[in-house]
Amino acid sequence: MSRRILIAGNWKMNMRAESGASLAKGIVDAVGKSPAVEVVLCPPSVYLSGVADAVVGTPVELGAQNLYAAEDGAFTGEVNASMLTDVGCRFVILGHSERRQLMGETDACVAKKLHAALAGNLVPIVCVGETLEQREADDTESVIETQIRGSLEGLDEARAANIVIAYEPVWAIGTGKTASKEQAEAVHAFIRELLGKMFSTEVAEQIRIQYGGSVKPGNAEELLSQPNIDGALVGGSSLKVDDFAGIIKAAPSA
């Protein structure tokens, strides 16, 4: 079935208020009024409102990089789903490898955030991926399956079609290395097959699976042309208008 390509820019801990607003406006101009693909910008939480102002009334959507699973309360420094929707977010990135590695986030933690996101009418982008050591040990599929089953724990078939999976090989993030189109497609196909076993083939065909890992204008077309790659979660290349626009333009319209 046809799945609309989703290109999401993860700004990570970069930009400032003025430069972020300028970047967002530049991307809005580059995208135009009727893009063939869905475009999401995920700035640092302190700049969500400013970027929201820049994209309001345009096809470009707003996303967050994380959330806390609880509702209002004594959770200093945290931001919940209600707060994110309040400032205009529609998407939220969950379980990024940097948070798994640096913040000690577990699959169980990601699952709690997943359910909080869905309850708050956010579309979760759930990240999974293997390290170089795991790939070289031929453990990619077992690692991915463990992460997906754990991160989607308790998710029923009725809501499963509302999520996005992002496959981000850890060894390709910020390293300049990129999985070949064959490597990426093989893992994406495995993920879709796994989702079919967990839910149903029909639901698995609806779930978008992004690739993330040093996506650039120069490799975007060959990656996004693969049958099971439904978009990109873009890091460094989302910080420059021309680079991000190049990735968007490289995406097929189906």
Swiss-Prot record:
GO terms for cellular component: cytosol. Substrate binds at N10, W11, K12, G174, S214, G235, G236. PROSITE patterns: TIM_1, TIM_2. The active site is at H96, E168. It is found in: Cytoplasm. InterPro entries: Aldolase_TIM, TIM_sf, TrioseP_Isoase_bac/euk, Triosephosphate_isomerase, Triosephosphate_isomerase_AS. Its EC number is 5.3.1.1. This is Triosephosphate isomerase. The lineage of its organism: Bacteria, Pseudomonadati, Planctomycetota, Planctomycetia, Pirellulales.
